[in-house]
Design a protein with these regions (language model features):
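Membrane-interface junctions at transmembrane-helix termini in multi-pass inner-membrane proteins
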Residues: 130-154, 337-368
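Interhelical loop/hinge segments that connect adjacent transmembrane helices in multipass membrane
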Residues: 1-7, 11, 148-151, 175-182, ...
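Interfacial/gating helices of multi-pass transporter permease domains
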Residues: 32-58, 175, 212-220, 238-258, ...
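Membrane-interface helix-loop junctions in multi-pass transport and translocation proteins
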Residues: 37-45, 111, 116-120, 144-190, ...
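Interfacial segments at transmembrane-helix termini and the short loops linking adjacent helices
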Residues: 109-126, 309-341
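Helix-loop junctions and terminal segments of transmembrane helices
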Residues: 33-34, 63-79, 253, 257-295, ...
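Signature of the first transmembrane helix
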Residues: 10-68, 103, 162, 182, ...
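C-terminal transmembrane helix end/exit motif
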Residues: 7, 70, 137-148, 169-170, ...
Length: 442
């Protein structure tokens, strides 16, 4: 009983720390966006956002799936210091070489495409995120469940970035300063990562076996490419087909949704190292118990969020960004239905397949999502702008969730009781009626 309590307490602490970390990662762009919306023009905000979107493609490619794969491997090796050092060193050097390669490709792209050359300073600034990706070893700390360090480190650098933003960005001509500050917090985190890592691991140069990681990494590279296509293609196509103001409307709307989604995903992210460990130790009962509790938590938190957003999104957008971004409210309303579906798909599909070493099955789900979202965006964006992107992304996410859950179904057994589900439904029905009546009165 005592051991179980300690485990629950540990997961609770990790959840709180990781919630702070992930919400802050999204609150920082939100808060900085609030300030920027009142200082910079939608055109320049759109340019900065679009450049971030482009560099993100290269960051994901350079990572080779290591953020996901590394958590599992570090978690499995954490009881053996020698093996832990070896796994860390192998993955670090793979990421090092890959990042340098894709950094070269990124600079070739900037020099080759005229629209990028016109904003070359902006793209060079954003390219720093790719360069310092060499030192992004969050997967080490997540695999070791060192969420307190991750969270506190993030608070410090995000706070510094916000102070710099208010101090230096004063008018529309300061959009390059805005871009620099957007990168400062992230790069600072990476540098502290590598310095602090000496407490847990030593970088080895001898007797390394890179080959043993290649098969899983190649699968995850394919998965990550597909994921990034269906998660980044909306902004990319909006930037291609529409004026940059439309990009800003969509990004500001989806950003609030992503903050709420991060809250929903936090618990599932935190338990991945624990689930991986339990699965490797063949502790099926504990494995299924934690999964069941996670699904119940998703339902308890997600459904009220969806209902609340339907009645408050207009006020939220006006309060945060001002009246000129009111069209972003419709984006939040539509995408909010994913606040339950996406975390369930992530947990019962993507994470389960990774933990059980079935990475190759993940390709099926994300490839379908990438194809459907690309086609959907191509058709809908030209006619419906930001709402076309929102519709396409929502439908693609639903498709991915269904495929994920289907593929992962045989590796776990949920113990959801009918009475518990009825209570959740009834409580949310009461909330829906209350908000509807309140809205009618207003």
């Amino acid at each position: 009983m005592g051991n179980e309590f300690m485990k629950e307490k540990s997961i609770l602490k990790n959840t709180i720390y990781y919630l702070i970390y992930n919400v802050l990662n999204l609150l920082f762009p939100l808060i900085s966006g609030i300030y920027a919306a009142r200082v910079l023009s939608p055109q320049n905000i759109g340019e900065v956002t679009y450049s971030q979107n482009i560099v993100q493609y290269f960051v994901i490619l350079a990572f080779l799936g290591i953020p996901t794969y590394g958590i599992r491997e570090i978690s499995n090796a954490r009881k053996n210091k020698e093996e832990l050092d070896k796994v860390f060193s192998e993955l670090f050097f793979i990421n090092f070489i890959s990042t340098l390669f894709f950094l070269g490709l990124y600079f070739i792209l900037i020099l080759s495409v005229e629209s990028f050359r016109n904003y070359s300073k902006l793209y060079l600034i954003m390219g720093m995120l790719l360069l310092f990706n060499i030192f992004n070893i969050n997967w080490l700390y997540e695999g070791l469940e060192e969420f307190k360090f991750i969270s506190l480190r993030n608070i410090v650098f995000k706070s510094i970035s916000l102070l710099l933003l208010v101090w230096f960005v004063k008018d529309d001509t300061d959009y390059l300063k805005f871009a620099v500050i957007m990168t400062v917090g992230t790069i600072g985190n990476y540098l502290i990562n590598i310095i602090y890592s000496r407490k847990y691991v030593s970088l080895k140069l001898k007797k390394l076996n890179f080959k043993r990681h290649l098969k899983s990494i190649l699968y995850l590279v394919s998965v990550n490419i597909a994921i990034e296509i269906y998660t980044l293609v909306d902004v990319s196509m909006l930037g291609f087909f529409c004026v940059k103001e439309i990009v800003a409307y969509y990004v500001y709307g989806s950003r609030i949704y992503k903050i709420l989604l991060q809250v929903m995903n936090t618990f599932t992210m935190v338990i991945v190292p624990r689930l991986s460990y339990l699965y490797s130790e063949n502790k099926k009962n504990e494995f299924n118990e934690i999964l069941t509790e996670a699904v119940k938590l998703i339902l308890l938190l997600g459904i009220p969020m969806i209902i609340g957003i339907q009645y408050t999104s207009n006020n939220i957008i006006t309060l945060i960004y001002g009246d000129k971004y009111i069209t972003s409210a419709a984006v939040i309303k539509l995408m909010s239905i994913l606040l339950v579906l996406t975390p369930i798909g992530y947990l019962l599909g993507s994470r389960i397949l990774l933990i059980t070493k079935n990475e190759k099955k993940m390709i099926i789900a994300v490839s379908l999502g990438a194809i459907s979202n690309t086609i959907g965006n191509f058709i809908l964006i030209r006619y419906y702008g930001e709402m076309g992107a929102a519709i396409s992304t929502t439908l693609s996410e639903i498709l991915v969730m269904l495929v994920y859950v289907y593929l992962g179904r045989k590796y776990y057994k949920l113990n959801l009781k009918f009475k518990e589900l009825i209570k959740i439904i009834f409580a949310n029905l009461v909330l829906f009626i209350f908000l509807k009546i309140l809205n009618e009165i207003k």
